[in-house]
């Protein structure tokens, strides 16, 4: 049994999929961890870049905006398909779907780490052979990781919620590897360009139409916003902070220490250009090969607890100001 923080005794988290909104038992609205952290990244001036890039490419802003939207939608669909395959494999082979039937819930109730004592007795260690079969033997490196932790007495949870009721922050952990004395957190990423841990960009070959990415990396002196302005402005920094916020939430709920954080990048095996980079086709999109072989790269991450505490201090001030403002409306 886990010693669940008593602040979770009377509060549950709900997710309205149609409105994409998180609330709790008391109808408080939550901000997702992802949304919160993107407030610390310099804002992308879409209007400016549409005007600049459309002029460079000789196409209308409307057409370029649609190409950007198509790329985003394709990436989301591809990422969701990979995430769902891994999630279903874990939940099916660990009896998770049966276990959550023991939680009093309505249709919008999220299963969270605060429910661990209710469901843990019904969760079984993943049957690795079944998981490998379920995921079509595509991720040998993932199987090695899971085998190690299963052998050492851990249970593996997928897509499980976490939240901080006092700060109205929520999130969903891709992979929670849990034992009664410690835990680890993992996350799947499917970015076309991979993970970067420094600010910068790849130079483009503008002699081709459409322009093609080259393998020449151009570093930039670009950082996140205070109080994390010592971190480079790149997806690796945001993802590291995301995992670290989740780790703090799990510690808050269960009171046990973190034993590790990792990001697992799954490359979809795109058609490559002459520079070895994903090729952009005349339709403006990047195409996956007909018979793709997905490649897994694992990144061990630091627990940025100090940075998390600074971000949560900011959030605490926002919550306090909101409550003061709300009270003044009724004074």
Language-model features, listed with the residues they occupy:
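Gram-negative outer-membrane beta-barrel domains
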Residues: 165-166, 170, 198-206, 223-230
């Amino acid at each position: 049994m886990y010693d669940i923080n008593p602040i979770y005794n009377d509060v549950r988290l709900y997710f309205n999929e149609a409105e994409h909104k998180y609330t709790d038992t008391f109808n408080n609205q939550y901000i997702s961890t992802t949304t919160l952290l993107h407030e610390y990244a310099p804002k992308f001036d879409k209007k400016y870049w549409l005007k600049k890039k459309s002029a460079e490419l000789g196409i209308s802003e409307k057409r370029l905006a649609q190409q950007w939207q198509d790329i985003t939608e394709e990436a989301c669909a591809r990422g969701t398909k990979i995430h769902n395959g891994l999630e279903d494999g874990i939940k099916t082979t660990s009896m998770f779907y049966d276990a959550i039937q023991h939680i009093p819930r309505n249709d919008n109730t999220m299963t969270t780490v605060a429910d661990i004592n209710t469901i843990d007795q019904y969760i079984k260690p993943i049957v690795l052979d079944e998981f490998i079969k379920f995921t079509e033997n595509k991720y040998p490196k993932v199987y090695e990781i899971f085998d190690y932790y299963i052998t050492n007495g851990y249970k593996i949870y997928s897509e499980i919620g976490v939240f901080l009721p006092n700060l109205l922050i929520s999130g969903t952990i891709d992979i929670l590897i849990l034992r009664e004395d410690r835990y680890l957190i993992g996350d799947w990423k499917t970015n076309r360009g991979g993970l970067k841990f420094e600010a910068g960009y790849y130079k483009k070959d503008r002699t081709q139409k459409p322009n093609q990415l080259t393998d020449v990396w151009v570093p930039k002196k670009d950082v996140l916003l205070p109080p994390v302005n010592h971190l480079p402005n790149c997806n690796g920094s945001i993802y590291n902070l995301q995992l670290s916020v989740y780790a703090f939430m799990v510690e808050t709920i269960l009171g046990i220490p973190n034993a590790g954080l990792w990001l697992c990048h799954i490359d979809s095996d795109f058609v490559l250009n002459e520079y070895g980079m994903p090729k952009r086709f005349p339709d403006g999109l990047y195409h996956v090969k007909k018979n793709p072989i997905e490649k897994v790269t694992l990144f061990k991450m630091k627990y940025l607890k100090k940075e998390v505490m600074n971000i949560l201090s900011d959030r605490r001030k926002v919550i306090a100001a909101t409550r003061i403002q709300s009270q003044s409306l009724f004074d």
